[in-house]
């Protein structure tokens, strides 16, 4: 049996990408942002189509993502941050709450959100992962933005027909 299959599309030409970067653990977050932006450019996203905003920490990322999503100006969003375990329960709280908030934005607004908020045991693990995870976030955002467009087109002209029926 033959089945239809969508091939991943990493062409970023014409896509608008919003990035929210936490400033807490700034060297790691800057490394994530640098590699992410470099990869977006490699994928064809132009600098004028990228908006980078910074927030104090990982818990503030979801609100900034929400505001970007509400603007309807972006094809995909990217969350960048680093939560590094300390000696208290705060690590679990920040990791869980920021992750849940980031996921909720994508689902509530129907916009792809690439989550590259690192959660590591120590600084060394964060530094070791920042370049690769920044690149991964760029690829995820571009691929999912293109997939979202392709899947929206599956509905065809149903929306127009519904609008015409409502007007009649």
UniProtKB/Swiss-Prot annotation:
5-amino-6-(D-ribitylamino)uracil binds at residues 24, 58-60, 82-84, 115. (2S)-2-hydroxy-3-oxobutyl phosphate binds at residues 87-88, 129. Signal peptide: none annotated. GO terms for cellular component: cytosol; riboflavin synthase complex. Pathway: Cofactor biosynthesis; riboflavin biosynthesis; riboflavin from 2-hydroxy-3-oxobutyl phosphate and 5-amino-6-(D-ribitylamino)uracil: step 1/2. One of its GO terms (molecular function) is 6,7-dimethyl-8-ribityllumazine synthase activity. The active site is at residue 90. Belongs to the DMRL synthase family. PANTHER family: 6,7-DIMETHYL-8-RIBITYLLUMAZINE SYNTHASE, 6,7-DIMETHYL-8-RIBITYLLUMAZINE SYNTHASE DMRL SYNTHASE LUMAZINE SYNTHASE. Catalyzes the formation of 6,7-dimethyl-8-ribityllumazine by condensation of 5-amino-6-(D-ribitylamino)uracil with 3,4-dihydroxy-2-butanone 4-phosphate. This is the penultimate step in the biosynthesis of riboflavin. This is 6,7-dimethyl-8-ribityllumazine synthase. It comes from Paraburkholderia xenovorans (strain LB400). The gene is ribH.
């Amino acid at each position: 049996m033959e089945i239809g299959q969508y091939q991943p599309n990493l062409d970023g030409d014409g896509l608008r990408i919003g990035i929210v970067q936490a400033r807490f653990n700034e060297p790691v977050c800057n490394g994530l942002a640098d590699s992410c932006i470099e990869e977006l450019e490699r994928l064809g996203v132009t600098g004028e189509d990228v908006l980078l905003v910074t927030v104090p920490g990982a818990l503030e990322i979801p609100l900034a993502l929400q505001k970007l999503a509400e603007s309807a100006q972006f094809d995909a969003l990217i969350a960048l941050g680093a939560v590094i375990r300390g000696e208290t329960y705060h690590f679990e709280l920040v990791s869980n709450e920021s992750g849940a908030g980031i996921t909720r934005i994508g689902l509530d607004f129907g916009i792809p959100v690439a989550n590259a908020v690192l959660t590591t045991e120590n600084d060394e693990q964060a530094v070791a992962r920042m370049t690769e995870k920044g690149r991964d976030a760029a690829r995820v955002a571009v691929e999912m933005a293109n997939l979202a467009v392709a899947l929206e087109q599956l509905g065809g002209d149903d929306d127009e027909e519904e609008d015409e029926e409502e007007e009649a």
